């Protein structure tokens, strides 16, 4: 039978996961990131994107908030294994702000992706995120078939 400490940490990781999706992303509250991520946080994203530290993570998230002011993320599936949480998600939004040099088009996006979060204690230390950037660029009208 698991001891109280690992069970408390497991529940803490689930709560952190919930807070990232619901309070940080959907609630637009990046000020919570230091409570939820380690100081030496690392992000591995599509196209070889590598971010180090909470400030770089905050910058990326705020960039998406600017590009898609009505952005909403939905957790479709979550799998917990030890200090890892894997999440299949879907994001929707309207391209009403600049996105990496792409002027706003007013077009809607609806794309799926997956993120694997590695925890140290109850804080996220590292993430690997995968989503179809090509589909997003097509949906905002930045590229055509």
Predicted regions and their residues:
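C-terminal and inter-domain tail/linker signature
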Residues: 1-145
């Amino acid at each position: 039978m698991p001891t109280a400490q690992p069970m408390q940490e497991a529940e803490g990781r689930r709560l952190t996961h919930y807070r990232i999706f619901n309070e940080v992303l959907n609630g637009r509250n990046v000020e919570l990131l230091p409570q939820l991520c380690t100081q030496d946080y690392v992000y591995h994203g599509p196209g070889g994107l590598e971010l180090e530290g909470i400030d770089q993570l905050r910058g990326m998230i705020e960039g998406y908030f600017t590009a898609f002011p009505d952005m909403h993320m939905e957790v479709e599936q979550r799998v917990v294994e030890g200090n890892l949480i894997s999440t299949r998600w879907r994001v929707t939004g309207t391209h009403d702000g600049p996105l990496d040099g792409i002027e706003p088009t007013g077009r809607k996006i609806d794309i799926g992706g997956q993120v694997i979060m590695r925890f140290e204690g109850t804080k996220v230390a590292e993430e690997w995120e995968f989503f179809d950037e090509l589909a997003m660029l097509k949906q905002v009208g930045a590229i055509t078939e």
